[in-house]
């Protein structure tokens, strides 16, 4: 279970237990990582549908979209390796690379 880190509240005890978000992830996937760790340790991961959050300015991904796509997919590889082991990461690597390539191809301007 995981929720978007765009708006995240966590108990201080959970932060002490796991430390902060894993800085090896660049901008993406650290919330998934933290959520999986919390879930495996027996913490509840809760979505509050009545909460309203406005992300007024979000331009990080727009500045260098290809670099952000690559960073996201590198983070996915790290996530698989961290949580499921080297063998799973080796199996997942071609799929992650293919998905990265496909996303980048869709993002290219037309002919």
Task: Report the location of each language-model feature.
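A short, conserved beta-strand element in the Rossmann-like catalytic core
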Residues: 9, 26, 33
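Nucleotide phosphate-binding site architecture
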Residues: 15-16, 26, 54
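Conserved nucleotide-sugar donor-binding catalytic segment
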Residues: 20-23
């Amino acid at each position: 279970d995981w929720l978007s880190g765009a708006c995240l509240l966590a108990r201080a005890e959970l932060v002490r237990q796991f430390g902060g978000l894993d800085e090896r992830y660049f901008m993406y996937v650290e919330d998934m990582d933290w959520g999986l760790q919390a879930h495996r340790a027996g913490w509840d991961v809760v979505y509050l549908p009545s909460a309203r959050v406005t992300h007024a300015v979000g331009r990080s991904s727009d500045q260098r979209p290809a670099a952000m796509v690559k960073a996201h997919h590198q983070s996915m590889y790290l996530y698989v390796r961290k949580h499921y082991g080297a063998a799973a990461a080796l199996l997942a690597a071609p799929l992650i690379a293919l998905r990265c390539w496909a996303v980048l191809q869709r993002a290219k301007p037309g002919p």
